[in-house]
A protein has these predicted regions:
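C-terminal lobe/tail of nucleotide-utilizing enzymes
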Residues: 1-26, 197-300
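A short beta-loop-alpha structural element at the N-terminal edge
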Residues: 301-314
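Helical mechanochemical/support elements of P-loop NTPase systems and associated helical scaffolds
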Residues: 67, 125-128, 132, 158, ...
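Conserved GNAT-fold acetyl-CoA-binding loop/helix
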Residues: 320-327
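Nucleotide-state-sensitive switch-loop elements of NTP-binding domains
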Residues: 18, 28-32, 55-59, 65-153, ...
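Residue-level signature of catalytic and energy-coupling elements of molecular machines
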Residues: 38, 113, 132, 152, ...
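Conserved catalytic-core segment of NTP-binding enzymes
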Residues: 55, 138-148, 153-238, 243-244
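Extreme N-terminal, non-catalytic leader segments
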Residues: 1-40, 44-61, 68, 94-98
Length: 327
């Protein structure tokens, strides 16, 4: 019998896995995958978080796992870095070996790199992520000595490559980034669904919590976090000063900055938050977090008819199917 037989897979999925560990993470290196909708502020939050952690004496590696390759831009003052995939291809064509000095760069104690991805229309982004991690392993990823490895993942895409850390237990915990809007919470809910799915398949990854970015005080993100059973690790306000500094590639997560306390709190919570098993919402549950005036959730579905589809009156024709009497 094939290991991919549907009956076998259903049988495996029906077994209740062990509970998610809820104690402190004890592995020497914490590998944390951060997911969120494009534009939700993942890269902004991670650049400042990683900088604050480094200033607190932690060894931090930040890896951009988004084909846009913009995770490290804020950290390096807007400068783009050579991606692992692009550099690997160039080195291979030249008959050379890729070295860590070709793709990893540092600022004030933070080490950072970009996996990259194919050009638009020229390949699979998820496959690019897998290739990138294969290259990291060849460069000695499992032998490096970091306290934290932060993985910045795009959450909009359902491709399995972007779910690699969850599917293969490559990280100990997941953090979602969202705001008080339906689309970012939809993505956060999907990430929770992915975690729950792989838990049922025997995985061990849990969700440590949510970073609430651009918080305008309306409360939907807090309600979502409470509903799915995860904590809010930090609430970054919707503030014009933060927006301007982020747009100008300025780090605000410095110990002497106006916003230092935000990222000190976030660094502490990210380090200590245990991985939890979330309870994802269905579509109606997600919509109910918002006023029906905003989402249109009070609309009742009206089925279409054949007459509607033809734009004219429709008369049901007798069937030509031959029905035989039972013998």
């Amino acid at each position: 019998m094939s290991m991919f037989d549907p009956g076998v897979l259903r049988e495996e999925a029906s077994h209740e896995p062990d509970p998610v560990p809820t104690g402190p993470v004890t592995k020497e290196t914490q590998i944390i995958a951060i997911y969120g909708k494009g534009g939700s502020g993942k890269s902004f939050a991670l650049a400042n978080l990683s900088y604050m952690m480094a200033q607190q004496g932690k060894r931090v590696l930040l890896i951009g796992c988004d084909p846009k390759s913009d995770t490290t831009s804020l950290l390096f003052g807007g400068k783009s870095t050579p991606t692992i995939i692009e550099t690997s291809s160039k080195k291979k064509l030249a008959g050379e070996e890729i070295g860590i000095e070709d793709v990893c760069f540092q600022r004030d104690g933070v080490f950072a790199m970009e996996l990259g991805g194919p050009e638009v229309g020229r390949g699979c982004g998820g496959r690019g992520i897998i290739h990138g991690f294969e290259t990291l392993e060849k460069l000695g990823f499992h032998e490096w000595g970091f306290d934290y490895v932060l993985l910045d993942f795009l959450g909009d895409v359902v491709c399995g490559g972007f779910g690699l850390p969850i599917a293969r237990d490559m990280c100990q915990k997941v953090i979602v980034v969202a705001s008080n809007d339906l689309q970012s919470l939809y993505v956060a809910n999907n990430v929770c669904k992915a975690v729950e799915y792989f838990r049922k398949m025997g995985g061990n990854v849990g969700v440590a919590g949510m970073i609430l970015n651009k918080d305008d005080g309306t409360g939907e993100a807090n309600a979502f976090a409470e509903a799915v059973g995860i904590p809010v690790l930090c609430a970054i306000p919707a503030n014009e000063d933060i927006r301007k500094k982020s747009a100008n590639y300025q780090i605000i997560g410095k110990p002497d900055s106006q916003w230092a306390s935000l990222f000190e709190e976030l660094a502490e919570n990210v380090a200590e938050a245990p991985p939890l098993r979330p309870t994802p919402l269905d579509q109606d549950g997600l919509l109910n977090l918002f006023s029906a005036d905003i989402t249109g959730a009070d609309y009742t579905l009206r089925p279409a008819t054949q007459a509607d589809m033809r734009g004219a009156e429709y008369v049901t024709k007798p069937s030509l199917e031959v029905v035989y009497d039972a013998v």
